[in-house]
Amino acid sequence: MSQSIIESKNKKDVNNGKIPAKETILSPRFYTTDFEAMENMDLSINEEELEAICEEFRKDYNRHHFVRNSEFDGAAEKLDPETRELFVDFLEGSCTSEFSGFLLYKELSRRIKDKNPLLAECFAHMARDEARHAGFLNKSMSDFGLQLDLGFLTANKDYTYFPPRSIFYATYLSEKIGYWRYIAIYRHLEKNPDSKIFPLFNYFENWCQDENRHGDFFDALMKAQPRTVKSLSQKINIGGTTFTHPLFDYFHRFRYFLNNLPITSKLWSRFFLLAVFATMYARDLGIKKDFYSSLGLDAREYDQYVINKTNETSARVFPVVLDVYDKSFYGRLDKIVENNKVLSNIANSEENKVSKTLKKLPTYLSNGYQLLRLYLLKPLDSKDFQPSIR
């Protein structure tokens, strides 16, 4: 988060109208996890709620929602070059993010279906939704004569490993923040139809309900997980080499026990909330600001609304949430945005690599300091915070 926002194009050539996603520090990430631990999860503590959510997934409320209509005909040609570029960049990032979710959920459903069929079915339904979203976004890109090469992404994207617990935190927040982002844009454009630059936004109201249901699933899954893993793993990976021994299962059990201590849960909750909020804020105010302006939105007001709402929603599952109402909270995020502009200017200068690195160092340290101060802000206890949001 404290690094600069430097964009570098993939070296793969553009062929047949397809383009690979551009990489930035704040680009959507592709994830993998411990499939053995996932398949051994005991859902019995909250199985009834998970089964109810799975039944909702089976109904597939949006089966017939993502059908294009005549409003798309010629819509791309109506955009001026600057707005066109901003919107295509939005489509690319959104499509990559949805496709990332599809790959993770699809692989999970495939790998755990024999031992954990309920969990596997839920992930399969969510993979269906994410694939539908990614395809719909990619179809909109084709209106501009472009298309993301999703096959190339699958084969060449770097995958970040997260243990299951971290996957739960990260994907829960990703889905819930996606809900608030989409519904905020939809409501704004319903009130300001002249700012609706493309018919894609007409689909956001129902679309965001998919995100909301996915978030509810991870909420229920986390409630099922306080010390409920039947068996973890007899394997351990050191330096890329996997070792197997029954004793390693006890090591993983001890690590899992530590991760489930109340203080640990509070620390991780604060970490993931801050990581997600700071990343979004830095991206939207740093490199996406003009896109939101094209929709008639103030990026700062929009992000603060989304962060506040996501923080409130997270109090239903996390033991603590961030004090986003502290007067220093957004001030420090704004400082990070300013620092990232400085880092970007240095990166784009004509100086040599060593000189650039030395000039960037104080700004990196400043970003790290701002993030540390934000993390150390006294959090809000969810049990005290919840009544005001329900």
UniProtKB/Swiss-Prot annotation:
Q: Which cofactor does it need?
A: Fe cation
Q: GO terms for molecular function, please?
A: iron ion binding; magnesium-protoporphyrin IX monomethyl ester (oxidative) cyclase activity
The first-level EC class reads oxidoreductase
What pathway is this protein a component of?
Porphyrin-containing compound metabolism; chlorophyll biosynthesis (light-independent)
> Does the keyword Metal-binding belong to this entry?
yes
Superkingdom to which the source organism belongs: Bacteria
Q: What does this protein do?
A: Catalyzes the formation of the isocyclic ring in chlorophyll biosynthesis. Mediates the cyclase reaction, which results in the formation of divinylprotochlorophyllide (Pchlide) characteristic of all chlorophylls from magnesium-protoporphyrin IX 13-monomethyl ester (MgPMME).
Q: What family classification does the UniProt entry report for this protein? A: Belongs to the AcsF family.
Q: What is this protein called?
A: Magnesium-protoporphyrin IX monomethyl ester [oxidative] cyclase
Instruction: State the taxonomy lineage.
Output: Bacteria, Bacillati, Cyanobacteriota, Cyanophyceae, Synechococcales
